[in-house]
Amino acid sequence: MAIQHPDIQPAVNHSVQVAIAGAGPVGLMMANYLGQMGIDVLVVEKLDKLIDYPRAIGIDDEALRTMQSVGLVENVLPHTTPWHAMRFLTPKGRCFADIQPMTDEFGWPRRNAFIQPQVDAVMLEGLSRFPNVRCLFARELEAFSQQNDEVTLHLKTAEGQREIVKAQWLVACDGGASFVRRTLNVPFEGKTAPNQWIVVDIANDPLSTPHIYLCGDPVRPYVSAALPHAVRRFEFMVMPGETEEQLREPQNMRKLLSKVLPNPDNVELIRQRVYTHNARLAQRFRIDRVLLAGDAAHIMPVWQGQGYNSGMRDAFNLAWKLALVIQGKARDALLDTYQQERRDHAKAMIDLSVTAGNVLAPPKRWQGTLRDGVSWLLNYLPPVKRYFLEMRFKPMPQYYGGALVREGEAKHSPVGKMFIQPKVTLENGDVTLLDNAIGANFAVIGWGCNPLWGMSDEQIQQWRALGTRFIQVVPEVQIHTAQDNHDGVLRVGDTQGRLRSWFAQHNASLVVMRPDRFVAATAIPQTLGKTLNKLASVMTLTRPDADVSVEKVA
């Protein structure tokens, strides 16, 4: 699908609050989130249109929640296949690991297949909602420089015209070969896998079985994935001595496909492309007024489908912080928490992806034999088998420092973890997901209590200036009890009983939830005021009447 760039006037000598380099998924998500926050954004993209061939094929529950946060999830869902299981097969076809988590704690299925070009198109179309956001295609970023209070970008159009853009901040979403990262000499440390893989996408799926299968064939490992809209993806390891040109030849392509199809000649090829699996992590995510996100900050093998999703986590973590800084509601030190929170988890996902690749294609043949034997034993260890089945090995993001307040060293503290998203009942009787009731805001959520009770008037003013929603959760049968209403507080019913269970488990009655849906702090009514003061301090929030016009980057 070819998505042409919109007819927009060039931004010659134009000033914006945020310039985003790259109109890939991370750049588009950043632009959508900042756009809805009223930030003046310019996206510049080297290509003349969105990439129109499939790349990533897995989108998880956290990424769908991010789509929900910018009002696009309903447009994205038609291009997904929910509850998409991943099955690892031995060379003889026995399934030794069946990963099909059925949890929806964040409001959406944990594993989903998707068609990336169509989802990217949804995000690009989403930008048309915001007059403060523009996207310029066919613009090459030739150079940039930082000053105390701005970044100057030098662009070149396809016709050779030069343009200058001045921005308060530059977010580099320009991919694994990031020009911005290389120009700043930020080390991009890691490894490149010795073997390449050839990806073959086929229309009118000739196999049409559901889910994704990864076969640990020692002769040539391969992957078979069912995608939405009747697309089938096959991936085959490129063996030593083979080249992409050789594998593209009809007789060799026929030989590859004969491993997985009875009639390799009767297929409709979309494309064939060879990939190298890299595992690399930028040493720094922030360099003064430049921030790295997505593949510009980290790249990982595809085996857990987390490259795309990690980029979405970057965008969700960074966008609300950047908006607060630009709006003068927080000092720019808040942006330092972006690397503090995201870098360690990105590394954990890289390590998991590398491990999954080694399980599929062990470096040594004896390791594959050992894998098959151990996997057989798992059938006799149900708790261990469930651990894999429910995908509990996936490192869930948890932040131990940053824009949050942790009391003590409680091992099972919910602070720094994503808050659940169950369905809730509104006072008018509508049932909706929790985030829909909150919007793109902070929230102070209390079980049964008035969340304003423990706050001073000054605190209420400060947190309302951030757009904070104050939520009182009650058992659904109490939702229409008028005597419990409080001005400025939204009451919701605990439709599924999940919120009561969550608060009971964590021995807290109040949660401060950030716009990216992570728990910033927990409290009880008597400690909420003190906790909010600590949180305002670590987030470097300004007072509603504070003058931050002299803010400088350290």
From Swiss-Prot:
Catalytic reactions on record: 3-(3-hydroxyphenyl)propanoate + NADH + O2 + H(+) = 3-(2,3-dihydroxyphenyl)propanoate + NAD(+) + H2O; (2E)-3-(3-hydroxyphenyl)prop-2-enoate + NADH + O2 + H(+) = (2E)-3-(2,3-dihydroxyphenyl)prop-2-enoate + NAD(+) + H2O
A GO molecular-function descriptor: 3-(3-hydroxyphenyl)propionate hydroxylase activity
The keyword Oxidoreductase is annotated on this UniProt entry: yes
Cofactor(s) annotated in UniProt: FAD
Residues that bind FAD: 17-46, 285-295
Pathway(s) per entry: Aromatic compound metabolism; 3-phenylpropanoate degradation
Annotated Gene3D superfamilies: 3.30.70.2450, FAD/NAD(P)-binding domain
Record keywords, A-Z: Aromatic hydrocarbons catabolism, FAD, Flavoprotein, NAD, Oxidoreductase
GO biological process, alphabetically ordered: 3-(3-hydroxy)phenylpropionate catabolic process; 3-phenylpropionate catabolic process
InterPro entries, per the entry: 3-HPP/3HCI_hydroxylase, FAD-bd, FAD/NAD-bd_sf, PheA/TfdB_FAD_monoxygenase
SUPFAM superfamilies assigned to the protein according to its UniProt record, in alphabetical order: FAD/NAD(P)-binding domain
Enzyme's top EC category: oxidoreductase
Family recorded in the similarity comment: Belongs to the PheA/TfdB FAD monooxygenase family.
Annotated function: Catalyzes the insertion of one atom of molecular oxygen into position 2 of the phenyl ring of 3-(3-hydroxyphenyl)propionate (3-HPP) and hydroxycinnamic acid (3HCI).
Protein name: 3-(3-hydroxy-phenyl)propionate/3-hydroxycinnamic acid hydroxylase
Lineage: Bacteria, Pseudomonadati, Pseudomonadota, Gammaproteobacteria, Enterobacterales
